[in-house]
């Protein structure tokens, strides 16, 4: 099973991706995670990527396709994979097609912008472990402190209000066009891929079940 997970920043793609990965025993390929690892490396490329993300812009198609191509060639992708964060542009989608990356399902997690802004700006992260909190929806026991270690929580530099609005603007201007691209592709291609739209403004478990229901009946 090969799945592309679409949705704006903060729509819950990462959470659902991990659940789908475990449910269907497929590899979760998150370009966001791979980019953050590159940034943590301290290399020149990582520094350049950080500047791009801090400005609320998208990483180049060339870089994204390169890391995805390398990743899907690994053995753990033989049973299938889920792409989280790619493609974000039509050129990326076209490049994946040229590489012969056949997709079975496109799942869009749909959430309104005002809710996305609230979700993202309230996020707090424990850098060492990656544990994630939210000031409203999942607050730590002590404000701005990790529940396990008591260490300070941080806000990602790209999670501030202005940057979030810019990211959503970029999403709607570029990434959202993929919805139409794949919807049209699905309507004219009887084989693959199949387009599925899911209401993301629900409990995590309900979103997951809606996704499973759609995948299992096709």
UniProtKB/Swiss-Prot annotation:
- Cellular location of this protein? Cytoplasm
Q: Can you tell which superkingdom this protein's organism belongs to?
A: Bacteria
Q: Where is this region: NMP?
A: 30-59
This protein's pathway: Purine metabolism; AMP biosynthesis via salvage pathway; AMP from ADP: step 1/1
Q: Name one GO molecular function term.
A: ATP binding
EC annotation from Swiss-Prot or TrEMBL: 2.7.4.3
Q: NCBIfam families this protein is in?
A: adk, PRK00279.1-1, PRK00279.1-2, PRK00279.1-3
Q: What's the family?
A: Belongs to the adenylate kinase family.
Q: What is known of its domains?
A: Consists of three domains, a large central CORE domain and two small peripheral domains, NMPbind and LID, which undergo movements during catalysis. The LID domain closes over the site of phosphoryl transfer upon ATP binding. Assembling and dissambling the active center during each catalytic cycle provides an effective means to prevent ATP hydrolysis.
Q: Which HAMAP family match?
A: Adenylate_kinase_Adk (MF_00235)
- Protein name in UniProt: Adenylate kinase
Recorded name of the encoding gene: adk
């Amino acid at each position: 099973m090969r799945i592309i997970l679409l949705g704006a920043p903060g729509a819950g793609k990462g959470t659902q991706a991990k659940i789908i990965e475990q449910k269907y025993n497929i590899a979760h390929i998150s370009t966001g995670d791979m980019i953050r690892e590159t940034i943590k490396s301290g290399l020149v490329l990582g520094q350049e990527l950080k500047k791009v993300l801090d400005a609320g812009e998208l990483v180049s198609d060339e870089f994204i396709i390169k890391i995805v191509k390398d990743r899907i060639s690994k053995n753990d992708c033989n049973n299938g994979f889920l792409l989280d964060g790619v493609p974000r542009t039509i050129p990326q989608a076209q490049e994946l097609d040229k590489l012969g990356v056949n997709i079975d399902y496109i799942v869009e997690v749909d959430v309104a912008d005002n809710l996305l802004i609230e979700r993202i700006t309230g996020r707090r992260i424990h850098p060492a472990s990656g544990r994630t909190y939210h000031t409203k929806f999942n607050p730590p026991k002590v404000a701005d402190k990790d529940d396990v270690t008591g260490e300070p929580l941080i806000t990602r530099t790209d999670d501030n209000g202005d940057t979030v609005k810019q990211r959503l603007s970029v999403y709607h201007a570029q990434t959202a066009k993929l919805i139409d691209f794949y919807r049209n592709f699905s309507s004219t291609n009887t084989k693959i891929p199949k387009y599925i739209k899911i209401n993301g403004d629900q409990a995590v478990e309900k979103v997951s079940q809606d996704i499973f229901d759609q995948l299992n009946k096709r």
